[in-house]
Amino acid sequence: MKKNLKFVLFSLAFLVSAAHINATIGKDPALKSKDVTYSIGNQNFKGYIAWKEDGKAVKPGILVVHEWWGLNDYAKMRADMLADLSYVAMAVDMFGDGKVYETAADAQNAAGYIFSHPDLLKERITKAYDILTSQENVDKQHIVAVGYCFGGTVALNAAAIGLPLEVVASFHGGLTDFKASEMMKNTKVLICNGAADAFVPQADIDNFKSEMDKYGITYEFKNYEGATHAFTNKYSTEAGKKFNMPIAYNEAADKASWQDMISFFEKYFPAK
């Protein structure tokens, strides 16, 4: 499903259409969100931006890249959780029109198409970056990317192609044929990996570490005992049974990895 990503940066012109600001989320009236619709060529994309009204006029920004299912409620929930930490978080739309896939086969095809068209990946993640940094309450100099499964791989490769990200945090993301680059030297990388993830063999881990060491990139690689692929998503156990995939939710790994991310942020990307 995953292919080596090699492509060149290019500039984008974009038009943003912001939708209504949503009502308060959950029980915290300070937590706000809005939908944003934007275009690349003739295709529309639907992002989701969350923030907390806590007296800070400008905050660091976080791109949240969804799993291969698409921009669903899970990705938006993670954006809300990051907003609660005093960041502005944007759950991005990598497939267009806010598409969410219901079957593993369709999701795999969609993700595979993105990875087999690296210019498309670059165009879409860069556009999302431009949307986030255009927000008045975002500190344009301090942006990171957080990704889950498919999204973790996208986030890593976004840094590798030169997107100016201070931090990348990948949760159970694929590492197949990953190639680092000189352009990643200023990006700190956190990998949160399930030790029992059948989709991330030791050879991929060894290659990843070798690539990072080659360019002197600061990174931490966390392994969570007994955790499989998609260990942070409570829906994954049901999906694994439904589609006969070796994935399952792991509460201990979910909580530990979230705390590891917070600790990593405190070192390299504190909310200001």
PLM regions: where:
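Short, proline-enriched alpha-helix->beta-strand connector loops that line the catalytic pocket
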Residues: 184-189, 215-218
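Serine-hydrolase catalytic machinery in alpha/beta-hydrolase-like enzymes
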Residues: 35-137, 234-248
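Short beta-strand/loop motif that positions the catalytic acidic residue
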Residues: 191-193
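Acidic catalytic loop of the alpha/beta-hydrolase fold
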Residues: 196-200, 229-230
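Short alpha-helix in the alpha/beta-hydrolase fold that links the catalytic acid
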Residues: 78, 201-211
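Primarily recognizes the serine-hydrolase "nucleophile elbow" in alpha/beta-hydrolase
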Residues: 125-185
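Bacterial N-terminal signal peptides
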Residues: 8-18
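C-terminal catalytic histidine-bearing segment of alpha/beta-hydrolase fold enzymes
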Residues: 215-272
